[in-house]
Amino acid sequence: MDKVGKMWNNFKYRCQNLFGHEGGSRSENVDMNSNRCLSVKKKNISLGDSAPQQQSSPLRENVALQLGLSPSKNSSRRNQNCAAEIPQIVEISIEKDNDSCVTPGTRLARRDSYSRHAPWGGKKKHSCSTKTQSSLDTDKKFGRTRSGLQRRERRYGVSSVHDMDSVSSRTVGSRSLRQRLQDTVGLCFPMRTYSKQSKPLFSNKRKIHLSELMLEKCPFPAGSDLAQKWHLIKQHTAPVSPHSTFFDTFDPSLVSTEDEEDRLRERRRLSIEEGVDPPPNAQIHTFEATAQVNPLYKLGPKLAPGMTEVNGDSCAVPQANCDSEEDTTTLCLQSRRQKQRQVSGDSHAHVSRQGAWKVHTQIDYIHCLVPDLLQITGNPCYWGVMDRYEAEALLEGKPEGTFLLRDSAQEDYLFSVSFRRYNRSLHARIEQWNHNFSFDAHDPCVFHSSTVTGLLEHYKDPSSCMFFEPLLTISLNRTFPFSLQYICRAVICRCTTYDGIDGLPLPSMLQDFLKEYHYKQKVRVRWLEREPVKAK
């Protein structure tokens, strides 16, 4: 008995160091089970007949008795040292206490916790026999099927001050055990901690009704994200047409600068697609185009490059012979160079067999001569016909802001500027829309002028030039004079119009020479007919 007492004291000391506050409340259970084990060893009492009586006792006593004492059928188990069974008794009692203290939501996490896979738990479970494990499983099933009232009394019922102290000690002990396990596991199996204060009291998200988006004034509180993005919301919900009621009732003082710029860009985009109103007494030039349009393309006033184009009611001509002036310089049809429009007859027939559409489009536009061609010809910075590579060779090594004016290499544009900025040579083409010249016709906020020379004069001032715009402060003068023929053309174009050149008593070649520097302004687009092409 002295040897058993020493072993028990050693085991009790280790359990107190391991479980902290849980040792005081659970040592009583171990003492009770050890005393019963010793008394049964002396009296050699068999528990085979007392099994029905154990069902009426508490679940903890059943587990302790069945694990502390094995059946009497095996004589070797009857004389076995009961101190070897004490660790299993303590482990099972810990699990039962935890099951009775924690909530049902945390019971599953407890089964998967680190205590089930601890080294001491695995070794001491092997010391139990198969019969002991089976009896433990039956007791667990029996405990789950008990009535809810008894479980509630066992978990939450407090009959005396002693029971209250034991419940509080279990709570503190379980908390300390959780901290110990979390320190042991570390980052491998982090345990999530829930805090009620971390959750927001209310959510910032709210449902937005469609009627709120159609209001003229912002219904959201000032300073919120929706109030700051109100101009973007109205940009996608309000109509863009200038004839809508939104523009009539809208207060410009409530709109930011960015919103106004976006609205102007959208209005310019619509005017480019639809055309502008022609001036009074202007001669309208009609251009009818019949195109085999692939269904992949969008059917609109701007036809994609590579489509068949026909003037008037004439028959279709081969793509390689499309050299007329009407075909090569029309902006609205986006006709590029002849090599970009060449399509083989086989591919054209293949597109027709796939169910293409035959579109008849009538495009109305007016021809206008460059208003200040005489001033441009007399300007020393104008070099005439020149490509970008020749311009870069002339500007190499020149200071910041050096520029020259030249003819654009693209057929859809008349002039371009080459200039030095950021230690390199850059190029910008001069675009035209509605009889105004600028470096970006699609953006109405960019500076525009009715003449090309007026545009160059504006960008000579560095203070009025943005970082992404051309800087034209120092002109690179040309080293040769223009011929008398060029100068005479500039003088004649100043005194007449594009349509007035046809009334001059000049040969057709000279008339074409006088019409060279002109641009086309689209004024109206009408869809005449759209019918599917019959498959051949």
UniProtKB/Swiss-Prot annotation:
The keyword RNA-binding does not apply. Residues 381-476 form the SH2 domain. Residues 471-520 form the SOCS box domain. It holds the Pfam family SOCS_box. It comes from the Eukaryota. Keywords: Growth regulation, SH2 domain, Signal transduction inhibitor, Ubl conjugation pathway. SUPFAM superfamilies: SH2 domain, SOCS box-like. Pathway: Protein modification; protein ubiquitination. The keyword Electron transport does not apply. PROSITE patterns: SH2, SOCS. Residues 158-169 have a biased composition (Low complexity). Interacts with EGFR. Interacts with ELOB and ELOC; mediates EGFR ubiquitination and degradation. Interacts with IL4R; inhibits IL4 signaling. The SOCS box domain mediates the interaction with the Elongin BC complex, an adapter module in different E3 ubiquitin ligase complexes. SOCS family proteins form part of a classical negative feedback system that regulates cytokine signal transduction. May be a substrate-recognition component of a SCF-like ECS (Elongin BC-CUL2/5-SOCS-box protein) E3 ubiquitin-protein ligase complex which mediates the ubiquitination and subsequent proteasomal degradation of target proteins. Inhibits for instance EGF signaling by mediating the degradation of the EGF receptor/EGFR. Involved in the regulation of T-helper cell differentiation by inhibiting of the IL4 signaling pathway which promotes differentiation into the Th2 phenotype. This is Suppressor of cytokine signaling 5. It comes from Bos taurus (Bovine). The gene is SOCS5.
